[in-house]
Amino acid sequence: MGNTNQFNAGSNTVADSNADFKFKFLSNSLQQVYTAEKQWAVVLPILRLAVGCEDLIATLNKFEKEGKAHIQRLEVIFKTLNIPLKEAQNKDIEVLIEECYDIIDVTPINSFIRDAGLIVGIQQIQQYQITEYTSLLAQALACDEHKAVNLLRVIVHNKHQEEEQLAMAGTSQMLDEILGD
């Protein structure tokens, strides 16, 4: 009978260790996503200035507003999980942002070529964010953190909507310019 208790005690230690690992991974991922969202919030106004298409400008304005709400939700998650709020370096988002800057550097001002290039660059950032948020959601589910799960579901849903809005932004205006109408 003593062996059974030792086995159970050992299982709890392994389970606790596994739970600690999952939570630490969730914490690190949360900091990465938070940093990426903060960096994206800084870049959006710059991209908006580089765009010529009114529909795309309006879409970026909406993304900026929604991004602030995402940051607030992430801050609630930090507080709920009792994780210190800090930004971590996120090289992945930096590379994607740099690609948008490169598009601005090599394309003519107020051209559909620049707008189309920026849409592609922004779509890459959107895909990255959706992937990261979905991973974070799965981690929160694995840690049984219900409030975080609910907030992350809202963000993932909004990110998918943003992706759809971006796909439609400026399409007719750019087509008119291409066709010379």
Region roles according to the model:
Residues 1-181:
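Amphipathic alpha-helical hairpins
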